[in-house]
Curated annotation (Swiss-Prot):
CDD domains linked to this entry: RuvC
A cellular component annotation (GO) from this entry: cytoplasm
Organism the protein comes from: Legionella pneumophila (strain Corby)
Listed name of the protein: Crossover junction endodeoxyribonuclease RuvC
Function as written in the Swiss-Prot or TrEMBL entry: The RuvA-RuvB-RuvC complex processes Holliday junction (HJ) DNA during genetic recombination and DNA repair. Endonuclease that resolves HJ intermediates. Cleaves cruciform DNA by making single-stranded nicks across the HJ at symmetrical positions within the homologous arms, yielding a 5'-phosphate and a 3'-hydroxyl group; requires a central core of homology in the junction. The consensus cleavage sequence is 5'-(A/T)TT(C/G)-3'. Cleavage occurs on the 3'-side of the TT dinucleotide at the point of strand exchange.
HAMAP family listed in its UniProt record: RuvC
Amino acid sequence: MTIILGIDPGSRVTGYGLIKESDRKIAYIDSGCIRTSNDAELSHKLLQIYDGICELMDHYSPTEVAIEQIFMHNNPNSALKLGHARGVAMVAAASHRAKICEYSAREIKQSVVGYGAAEKDQVSHMVVELLQLNRAPQKDAADALAIAICHSHMRNGLSKLIGSRGTKRRRMRL
């Protein structure tokens, strides 16, 4: 069994989603949001994110963490803040010796919905379906669960390829 923590980083709200994977089946564990204080300095917000991720790592002991890659904002200041939030989340996970993988928004949507330009409500719907939830989680938590699901799909896709063929190269016949 593998426990995967998905992280949707943000300087105000960082979503998290935990799933367990066993025999190529996934199940929901927990999800939610780490909300930082609106009036806090950036350094204190980053500390809140770090502490929140460390708490999750201590409580659930995930061995693998998946996080969304940074994308360009129209506002460079927002992109920098997002980069800081992402960085402290990665440091918190790395300090607990977790394997960290990064995925683009397009890869996540493609993996979960089957369409790389899917809308957020489509992603949320598929998270509910795939994890058999009674209702949709909060927006940022749903995104984090989608990131964890993407990681599960990617790691299983690669292990299937490696497992079925090994590392032996085969000659293609024309």
